[in-house]
């Protein structure tokens, strides 16, 4: 069997953060949570909820099914404008 859904979500988030050049603090601000909450979810100490997955997909400009398909598909679905090195609008509360 392949990876579990929680692992797939954590890996997709990590891959998207890397591809977009986004920090945990920036992602936390966009989702309205603390950086510590993002860290706990990424370490597996807490789980990403389905509502979180939907918010993450919206934040990264993709369909939630592409996001849930795992890191490879999620990165393929990431819009060019959100990729690292591209100019993207700042996220509410993000410090640049």
What do the predicted segments below correspond to?
Residues 51-66:
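DNA major-groove recognition helix of helix-turn-helix/homeodomain DNA-binding modules
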């Amino acid at each position: 069997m392949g990876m579990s859904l929680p692992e797939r979500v954590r890996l997709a988030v990590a891959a998207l953060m890397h591809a977009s050049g986004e920090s945990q603090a920036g992602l936390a601000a966009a989702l309205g949570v603390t950086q510590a909450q993002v860290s706990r979810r990424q370490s597996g100490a807490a789980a990403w909820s389905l509502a979180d997955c939907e918010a993450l997909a919206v934040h990264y400009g993709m369909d939630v099914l592409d996001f849930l398909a795992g890191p490879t598909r999620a990165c393929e679905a990431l819009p060019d404008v959100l990729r690292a090195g591209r100019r993207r609008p700042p996220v509410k509360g993000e410090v640049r």
